[in-house]
Amino acid sequence: MVKKSKGRQKIEMVKMKNESNLQVTFSKRRSGLFKKASELCTLCGAEVAIVVFSPGRKVFSFGHPNVDSVIDRFINNNPLPPHQHNNMQLRETRRNSIVQDLNNHLTQVLSQLETEKKKYDELKKIREKTKALGNWWEDPVEELALSQLEGFKGNLENLKKVVTVEASRFFQANVPNFYVGSSSNNAAFGIDDGSHINPDMDLFSQRRMMDINAFNYNQNQIHPNHALPPFGNNAYGINEGFVPEYNVNFRPEYNPNQNQIQNQNQVQIQIQNQSFKRENISEYEHHHGYPPQSRSDYY
């Protein structure tokens, strides 16, 4: 197999003729040189001073503990007094600890950066695979133009309609119809009698609404829990018919005149009974109620 590129080759150590390449190489090599000097100071505790002039006559320097102290010691070559030497050692120890912490932090940050780069490459590969499969809804919208965004919106609306239809079919197949009569519960899922779909309705709120309506109790509906009394007049001459059910929770308030009212009612009932007896009308006979009773003397 023929190689398409020359690969990594040894660079010839001559001055570069291209100015742009020269500036780029100087910047990269200078950073690498200062990094190596910092590692040498950290690992070995050495004192280093580096002064570099760029091709544009700019000065760059690096020194540990600092450039001035290292240069002064190199020029004068005089040993420091004992007390100054001790102070210098304390300062150097403190600086070394700070530099060590910074180097450790830099190492951690660089390792995290490499990890994030690997994750980015993996996600990029996954995105390319999904894009090839046709998962257009996972494309980043930040990279789309206005016309592409309008088309993306239309595709999402069509997808919403399809999902609404499938969800309504699923609910109709799995949820029984609790509504009485000819009405259909398709409207609860966004579909009316004409099979028109309303994709703007929330399926989850519709499901909750359906569950509530399906088991809704109508308090106005009459449930005859016991047999009704017969039509006609009772022993007191009162016409009987449908009566409301007894309410267990009903508690009448106390009325101090209740006994007096009951006595008056009893007196009225006695007067009515006496009037019936004077007219020779049976207290169990019904004349004006429904249904009429058959009598032989009518014929």
UniProtKB/Swiss-Prot annotation:
PROSITE patterns in alphabetical order: MADS_BOX_2 (PS50066)
Main location: nucleus
Role description: Probable transcription factor. Required for suppression of cellularization and promotion of nuclear proliferation during early endosperm development. The FERTILIZATION-INDEPENDENT SEED (FIS) polycomb complex is required for suppression of ALG62 expression at the end of the syncytial phase of endosperm development.
Subcellular location, record wording: Nucleus
Sequence ranges assigned to domain MADS-box in this UniProt record: 6-66
GO molecular function: DNA-binding transcription factor activity; protein dimerization activity; RNA polymerase II transcription regulatory region sequence-specific DNA binding
Protein name per its UniProtKB record: Agamous-like MADS-box protein AGL62
